[in-house]
Amino acid sequence: FSDSLLAIARAGAGVNNIPLEACAQEGIVVFNTPGANANGVKELVLAGLFLASRDIVGGIEWCKANKEDANIAKSAEKAKKAFAGCEIKGKKLGVVGLGAIGAEVANTAIALGMEVYGYDPYISVNAAWRLSRDVKHTTSLDTICQECDYITLHVPAVDSTKGMINKDALDQMKDGVVILNFARDILVNEDDLAEALKSGKVKKYVTDFANPKSVNLENTIVIPHLGASTGESEDNCAKMAVQEIMDYLENG
């Protein structure tokens, strides 16, 4: 590090790409920007919910593949049966992690008519105030696994959460469950998940993390880390980071 470096601001919530121990040894303060990109990620999670429930992508690809068919309108009426899905209204959604993003996902899912369960043993007072009173708070991940049709992950990548979705957790889940991971890829044991996808235990896996394993999983929608890839999210993160640095330099 340069001797003049006093602080580092990370434009995002995760700080796993910053050498925290080295910074601490040098007295360099590290900031992140939690919540600045929450709306952008929330909207992509909702898109994932819809993509997993309705085979929209399959239908679009069918149209592209049959664009030379002069009778495509008639053909589509027969073909569309293969892309039938289900509605999310009335389904049970389990939100694991009720920070800024998880709370927004939970509240919006309530507004869409879903029955929402929330699990977060470390929920803050501010996060609790943001959460709809209609969210059913549970103290056990097991309850989420056993009760929910959809499970979405919104926890940080730490030792206690690495591989939290493993064979034991998957075995407790409903047949045909949908799992969404827009937090960190290492939260899911992808070897165990591969078996659950193959057997049909997990109907669909939606992830915002492309890696050599995820892109080869069956019944999986892989998105190239687009959660915060909006102009609004980038602006919000930059503004928060600048404000944090200025406040530290001016006030300590």
What are these regions (language model features)?
Residues Y117, P121-K213, S229:
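Rossmann-like adenosine-cofactor binding region
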Residues P34-K92:
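Phosphate-binding beta-alpha-beta segment of Rossmann-like dinucleotide-binding domains, i.e.
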Residues G102-A103:
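N-terminal Rossmann-fold NAD(P) dinucleotide-binding loop
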Residues V215, G227-G252:
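NAD(P)-dependent dehydrogenase/reductase Rossmann-like domain
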Residues F1-N32, Q146, N166, N189:
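An N-terminal-biased, well-structured beta-alpha scaffold segment characteristic
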Residues L98-G99:
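Glycine-rich Rossmann-fold phosphate-binding loop(s) that bind the pyrophosphate
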Residues A11-G12, G27-N39, A183, H225-G227:
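Short beta->alpha connector loops at strand-helix junctions that form conserved
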